[in-house]
Amino acid sequence: VITLYPDENGVPDIDALKAAVSEHTAALMITNPEDTGIYNEKIKEFVDIVHAVGGLCVYDQANLNGLFGITRARDAGFDMCHYNLHKSFSSPHGCQGPAAGAQCVCEKLAKFVAAPTVEFDGEKYYLDYNRPDSIGKLRKFYGVPAVLVRTYAYIRTLGPDGMKQIAEMSILNNNYMLKKLLEIKGISLPYAK
């Protein structure tokens, strides 16, 4: 594991990434925007660098609120992303028990996804356990499906325009808080613009 430290703009140093990757690189895992609220404008270039050496790119969607309706992981070429439903989709953390996650993968990784997967045969949905290339089952339980139902209802209720408005308000709130923090004597942020 190689940690890439931020450059003068507060995002991982792209030159450090170029120096770190090789034919032995398995993957890059990155969050965008960073937890500091800084957007990595070179995210597509990061993905291209890792793909050029045969690595995969995993997008941690922990801070997805600032991206709804503005950009998509697919647009940057990510191979896999996972969602923190309790952060971005109004589902309480744990939701009365162990959480249920959501992840998306590109077509070439689909056969490796943990079993079972939910499939549709044209008439009904079913759980598919017959996945010979899968990493198998991760837990004895299925998580808490209510988290997924809440997430689905949240997305359907808001629709595309509402989801984009969430992103716009998230960015506005982040910038407002940044300005307010910088008004406090003794507080500075190394990457504040």
Language-model region placement:
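Conserved PLP-enzyme active-site core in the AAT-like
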Residues: 1-122
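Active-site C-terminal subdomain of aminotransferase-like
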Residues: 80-193
